[in-house]
Structures are given as C-alpha cells and as structure tokens.
Amino acid sequence: MAGKSSNGDGVKFADDAGSGNSIDGIAIIDPGTVTSASGGSGSDAGSGDSGNTPRKRGRPAGSGTGAKRGRPAGNSAAKKVPGNLGVEKILFSLHLMASSALKVEELALDEKEAEALAGAVQEVASHYDITPDPKIMAWAGLFGVCASIYGPRVAAYKMRAAAEKRDKKEAAKPMAQKVQEAKPTEHDPAAPYIEQLPVSNTL
C-alpha cells in the first residue's frame, strides 16, 4: 500500500512502494500522485487530460449583485406623477371662484370639463421628473373640496342679496312718486300779492 510523505513546503507526496523506481537512491515521483496540503486529490489539481482551463480567483463576471455601471435604475426614466391628485377638484373650484369674482358665469366648469382638463395636466406632468409633495397635494385637495362645497353657497348668497337690494329699490320708487305728486304747491314770497278789496258801487 502506498504511503504519503511531505516536504517542508507542505506538499504531500504519495510514495509508490511497489514501483521501485529510483535513481541513485532518489525516488522518482509521479506528478499525478502529488496532492495539495488541503487534502485534495492529484487529479483535481488540474491535469492535462481534463481539458478545462484553470479557474480564476474572484467573482465571475456578471454574477455579482452590485449596482451596474451607468445611470441608477431610479433615474433611468422620469418619475411618474400619481394619477389621483385631486387636480380636477382644484381646477373646478378655481374656475368657480374666478367666475364668481369676475361675475362671468361662462368661466365656471362642469365636472366633465374639469376631469378632462385635469387629465391633460397630468399627462403633461408625467413626462417630467416631478415628485409632488404628499402634504402639499393633501392641502390642495382639502382646499379644492372646501371651495367646491362653499363656493356655490357664497355665490348664491351674493346673488340673493343683490336681488333683494334691487327689489327694495324698485318698491321704493312708486312711493317716492306718490309723495311727489301729492305735495301741495307753495306760494312764492317774491311774487307780488294783491289783495282784492270789495268795490262799492255807491259814490
């Protein structure tokens, strides 16, 4: 049975006790019987018959999980704007307040027009690197809802107050005319006043 010996470098040699091959007392070692100090076999050390290239140290190319070169994945495309931002409510309320302030009823939008305009605005914003602040959008949505609720009420109140004021003016006009017609004529103190005395026919 073949034994193993090692030299000072930690390389083990498999002794071929039965071969008897030696030159001048020095044993001839077959390279195929050399094993590393870690206990691997000689055939695993990479023989010429395997036909495989020696494996290089380090991580294989493309197998790592690290970030790839180039632009980061987060910046490869523009950030999309969330669809539900309440833009249509904001636009609806803004046009409603503008129509009330300018007294132009044609500026007010209905729900379908506000929705179509909001969709167009969001489509344009989706092509830009925009990330809306959720807090700002929440406050804007609250403002839009409040304006859509209270805006029509304020406009209706103003219209009713204006109508009542106009009705009061119309009701006061006939009264003023009646008072003016019933007013007696006054004597002009500058005009000469001649008192007619009774004339006696007797002389």
From Swiss-Prot:
Residues 180-189 have a biased composition (Basic and acidic residues). Coiled coil: none annotated. Residues 1-80, 166-203 are annotated as: Disordered. Assembly protein. The major coat protein P3 and two assembly factors (P10 and P17) are needed during the assembly of the virus particle inside the host cell, when the capsid protein multimers are capable of enclosing the host-derived membrane, containing the virus-encoded membrane-associated proteins. This is Protein P10. Residues 39-49 have a biased composition (Gly residues). Keywords: Viral capsid assembly, Viral release from host cell.
